[in-house]
């Protein structure tokens, strides 16, 4: 499982470990335990400071659970399952962060986490094919390392079906806090911090203030391609630049296949995001990641209040916050997010293997989702509001070749129906006749486009009713 090439890379990564680290594996019998034991032994072999210990530990839930111990003391980080696939990076980063490698968490966020003074037990349910899950696991692992009141456990849902059933989990990542659902589906570090501040409202006031940045020439909101480009261009002029991003990479990071970036015939969102980060690091740009701007105070010097409580003063503000998934806004949608309603086919598709699902939306995103899901699920029904699909012809032609994809056009989704806490059917209207119909199914993937991330600009600049920024013929907003 651990190839010679990976061992060589791990040897280099771990050469600066500053303390002994143990993988403490729970004793007992399990069909996957030998595989996990070999996996951990191979990793431990790359450095004398790493070791594998088998021990009966009350906090470990099964014989395929292990914890990281630093100097024979628990770090608060637990893995239940074999962290291979996308989660291998989560394990490696946990090892490195525990033994001295600097964390990438913003200093303001670190101060908030250090201020937690009550026990917080996080459980993160993942699938090893989920490309969003590692970000959540890695963030919570860092929380645990920063504060001994916090524990973080990654749980591979594929190896714990009884827990998936018990907790009614139908999408990943799903995060439980002290046994209750804390966050699911569209989760990132900024969301975790925001929800944690809701859970403990006085965290920001208890936290030690982060070091104040000097006056910035340019501050950019948004970490997608547009925001990164703006920051780089400004930095090349010798200006003092800060980039604020809830999630570096933006929507691009969640895109698995990119084939329309001229000069790059094919790439993936994570690869492109990594290249953007490398490019940004070539310049003197301050990156404030996993933070939200909660308030903008106008004036010659603009003041931005961040979710950490930090205030950034800037001469110029560039907003490149992009867009987010558009919601249906029908009864049953929000109530069933994570219980049958999803927005990411790559993340949640595996949970519907052999089941019937719907995709709402007949544009490129919807048809691509249907194509991806058709290789996993029993059947896919695509519902399109308009009389014709708006997806590119090449995608429509591919879809026509799949026997398990059905298309319903001119259909308006009316509500999502659930039984026993799980999605059981969709209700829609045939727009031509007005007839209301229902179709039994197990999951619904919403792919109906995007809405602007412009909430923070309300009252700052003029917006359209849809949240778009109004500009004049010179590209100027209503605010100087």
Where is each model-derived feature located?
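Beta1-alpha1 glycine-rich phosphate/pyrophosphate-binding loop at the start
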Residues: 127-128, 132-134, 140, 145, ...
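Thioredoxin-like thiol-disulfide oxidoreductase module
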Residues: 43-71, 153-172, 176-181, 187-192, ...
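FAD-site-proximal beta/loop scaffold in flavoenzymes
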Residues: 324, 329, 334-351, 447-480
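A Rossmann-like FAD-binding core segment of flavoenzymes
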Residues: 273-314, 319-321, 374-473
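Residue-level detector of alpha-helix initiation sites
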Residues: 224-226, 323-325, 363-365
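A short, basic/flexible loop-to-alpha-helix module at the beginning of a structural domain
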Residues: 198-216, 342-352
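Local sequence-structure signature of Cys/Sec-based thiol-disulfide redox active-site neighborhoods
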Residues: 3-41, 46, 113-148, 154
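Non-catalytic, surface beta->alpha helical segment in thiol-disulfide oxidoreductase systems
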Residues: 69-102, 176-205
């Amino acid at each position: 499982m651990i190839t010679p090439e990976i061992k060589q890379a791990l040897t280099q990564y771990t050469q600066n470990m500053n303390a002994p680290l143990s993988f403490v594996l729970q004793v007992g019998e399990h069909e996957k335990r030998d595989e996990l034991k070999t996996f951990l032994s191979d990793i431990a072999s790359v450095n004398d400071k790493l070791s594998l210990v088998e021990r009966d530990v009350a906090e470990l839930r099964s014989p395929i659970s292990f914890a990281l111990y630093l100097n024979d003391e628990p770090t608060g980080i637990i893995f239940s399952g074999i962290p291979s696939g996308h989660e291998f990076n989560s394990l490696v980063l946990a090892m490195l962060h525990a033994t001295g490698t600097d964390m990438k968490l913003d200093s303001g966020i670190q101060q908030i986490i250090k201020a937690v003074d009550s026990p917080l037990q996080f459980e993160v349910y993942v699938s090893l094919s989920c490309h969003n899950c590692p970000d959540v696991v890695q963030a919570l692992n860092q929380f645990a390392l920063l504060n001994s009141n916090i524990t973080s456990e990654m749980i591979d849902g594929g190896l714990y079906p009884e827990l998936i059933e018990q907790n009614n989990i139908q999408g990943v990542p799903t995060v439980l806090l002290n046994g209750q659902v804390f966050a699911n589906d569209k989760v990132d570090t900024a969301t975790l911090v925001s929800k944690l501040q809701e859970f403990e409202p006085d965290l920001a006031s208890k936290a030690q203030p982060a070091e104040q940045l000097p006056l910035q020439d340019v501050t950019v909101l948004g970490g997608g391609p547009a925001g990164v480009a703006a920051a780089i261009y400004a930095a090349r002029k010798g200006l003092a630049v800060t980039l604020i991003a809830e999630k570096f990479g933006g929507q691009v990071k969640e895109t698995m296949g990119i084939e329309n970036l001229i000069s790059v015939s094919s790439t993936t969102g994570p690869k492109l995001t990594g290249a953007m980060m490398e490019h940004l690091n070539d310049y003197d740009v301050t990156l404030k990641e996993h933070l939200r701007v909660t308030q903008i105070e106008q004036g010659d010097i603009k003041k931005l209040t961040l979710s950490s409580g930090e205030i950034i003063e800037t001469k110029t503000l560039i907003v490149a916050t992009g867009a987010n998934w558009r919601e249906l806004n029908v009864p049953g949608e929000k109530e069933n997010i994570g219980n049958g309603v999803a927005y990411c086919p790559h993340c949640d598709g595996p949970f519907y293997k052999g089941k019937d699902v719907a995709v709402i939306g007949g544009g490129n995103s919807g048809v691509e989702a249907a194509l991806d899901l058709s290789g996993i699920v029993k059947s896919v029904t695509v519902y399109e509001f308009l009389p014709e699909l708006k997806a590119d012809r090449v995608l429509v032609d591919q879809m026509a070749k799949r026997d398990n994809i059905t298309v319903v056009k001119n259909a308006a989704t009316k509500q999502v129906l659930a039984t026993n806490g799980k999605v059981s059917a969709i209700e829609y209207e045939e727009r031509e006749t007005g007839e209301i119909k229902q179709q039994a199914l197990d999951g619904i993937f919403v792919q109906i486009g995007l809405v602007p991330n412009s909430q923070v600009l309300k009252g700052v600049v003029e917006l359209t009713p849809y949240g778009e920024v109004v500009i004049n013929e010179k590209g100027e907003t209503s605010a100087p």
